[in-house]
Design a protein with these regions (language model features):
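Intrinsically disordered, low-complexity terminal tails and inter-domain linkers enriched
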Residues: 5-14, 20, 130-159
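Short functional micro-motifs and their immediate structural scaffolds
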Residues: 35-39, 56, 66, 76
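A short glycine/serine-rich beta->alpha loop
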Residues: 58, 99-110, 173-184, 224-231
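A structural-propensity feature for long, helix-poor, extended segments
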Residues: 205-249
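Polybasic, low-complexity association/targeting segments
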Residues: 89-120, 263
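Short cysteine-rich clusters marking metal-coordination/redox-active sites
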Residues: 30-33, 48-51, 61, 68-71
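Conserved phosphate/anionic-ligand binding catalytic regions in large, soluble enzymes, centered on
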Residues: 112, 179-198
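Residues immediately within or flanking Cys/His clusters that coordinate Zn2+
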Residues: 27, 45, 58, 65, ...
């Protein structure tokens, strides 16, 4: 049984009491009505149409619906965490495609900021890399010395992976939606930096590790800028995963296979670059 089928099977009806109905969710545009989003140069106070809380927001749909980041990504990790923690997939791009095909992962949105580092940590582990807390309890990755020989086969439940992924989630959920356009820093690139920071045990005063995640983020942003806009969370996620995998092999000695991806989401993306996208299926 494949990883995705296991997740789908876990969602089959049972005798438990039914869950509270979820708000309508469209694949792209406004989650409530599907209409295009309107972006503003300055933030405005808006009430989330789902949770009712008030936020400073930079966009709403044409009908005025605003959905906060927490509600936008709500429930996505409940689907992709079990998949990642049980996966043996070594190709981070294949793993990314599995995750973004799951329920509650929308065409665009801040959930992608979380998916990128979690996918990379899982693929790193599956290719023999040691995560913080594995075996000796020390960071096996080093900014100057490649990882030691691949560790022994892992058990179905890997505490080191679970802890690393949960820490990646905690950090990446602090990256708001829209940072690509408003900060000049795509959340997928920040996610790649989170991945490398966790591997190296980086912190603000770590002399050796401190520059490495920043260099990775810079490389990711350079590639994202070369391809151009407007934003596409699927495209930038794939680009950042590719760059991160290449730098992981170069800096840490752990090779990750990378598939040639042809996008399946172009019909859901109103702003698709078409033939100008490196993942356009008809190139």
């Amino acid at each position: 049984m494949t990883d995705i089928k296991r997740i789908e099977k876990a969602q089959e009806p049972c005798c438990c009491a039914p869950e509270k109905p979820q708000a309508p969710s469209h694949e792209s545009g406004c989650l409530l009505c599907g209409k295009p989003l309107v972006y503003w140069p300055e933030a405005k106070s808006r009430v989330c149409a789902i949770c009712g809380k008030t936020f400073e927001a930079n966009c709403a749909c044409e009908d005025g619906h605003f959905v906060c980041d927490d509600c936008h990504r709500a429930g996505a990790d409940a689907f992709f965490l079990p998949l990642l923690l049980s996966s043996t997939e070594k190709d981070p791009l294949k793993l990314f495609e599995q995750v973004v095909s799951l329920p509650r992962v929308h065409m665009h949105g801040p959930e992608h900021h979380c998916i990128v580092p979690c996918v990379l940590l899982t693929a790193y582990r599956n290719n023999g890399g040691q995560l913080p807390g594995a075996s000796s309890g020390l960071h096996a990755a080093s900014p100057s010395v490649p990882s030691a020989a691949p560790r022994a086969p892992f058990s179905p439940v890997d505490p080191a992976l679970e802890n690393s992924v949960k820490e990646a989630l905690r950090r990446s959920k602090q990256v708001p939606g829209g940072t690509c356009g408003y900060w000049g820093v795509c959340g997928a690139a920040a996610g790649a930096g989170i991945y490398m920071s966790i591997l190296l045990g980086s912190n603000p005063v770590h002399k050796d590790a401190w520059p490495i995640p920043q260099q990775l983020v810079a490389d990711c942003l350079q590639k994202i800028a070369e391809v151009g806009g407007p934003r596409c969370c699927k495209r930038t996620g794939r680009l950042c995963i590719t760059i991160a995998a290449e730098r992981t092999a170069e800096w840490l000695g752990i090779d990750m296979p990378l598939s040639e991806i042809r996008c399946r989401f172009l019909r859901q993306n109103r702003e698709c670059l078409g033939p100008d996208c490196p993942y356009f299926p008809l190139r």
